[in-house]
Amino acid sequence: MVTLPGTAAASTPTLMWSGAKRVNILCNVAGGPGIDHVALTQQLCREVKRLALKRSPLPIETIAIGDPAVLGADAVTLLVHASVARHGKDRLLAFNVRPYRTSSEQASVLFGAPPRAATISTYIARSPALDAALAAALSETLPWLARPVAPQPLKSRR
């Protein structure tokens, strides 16, 4: 058996976080007829904020589209883009979380946390499936929630 390093978390945060003094959360939920995307956007932002605040060394606020706080040089904004579709009696919420900072073009994140999905009821009310999906995405986005990854053993092809 050969042991190679797996996808490992960086030992230090990416340059995007250098000098950051606050975190903004900006959500946008799209949906078809009968989907209250405004209410779902607000609920999703509240859940992301609740999870992001765990062990956070920085203040975290939710903001709305058009808020000039996105342009703050000392802020990292988490862009949470989601889409909702009916899935039987439930709804399927697919989302992506990406950090954005205006002052860090050289340190921008090209490929961050992969898109995830979870079923939800009419409202995002602390759904265990959504909590797990959001926590996984945030652990790949926020340095203080990063989960250490150990080297993974791989079987050699002999």
What do these predicted ranges mean?
Residues 2-46, 147-158:
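A structural "domain/chain start" motif
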Residues 4-6, 11-15, 106-158:
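C-terminal/domain-edge helix-coil "capping" segments
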Residues 21-23, 46, 50, 86, ...:
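A generic structural micro-environment signature
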Residues 25-75:
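N-terminal segment of the mature soluble domain
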Residues 66-120, 124, 128:
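Surface-exposed short loop/turn segments
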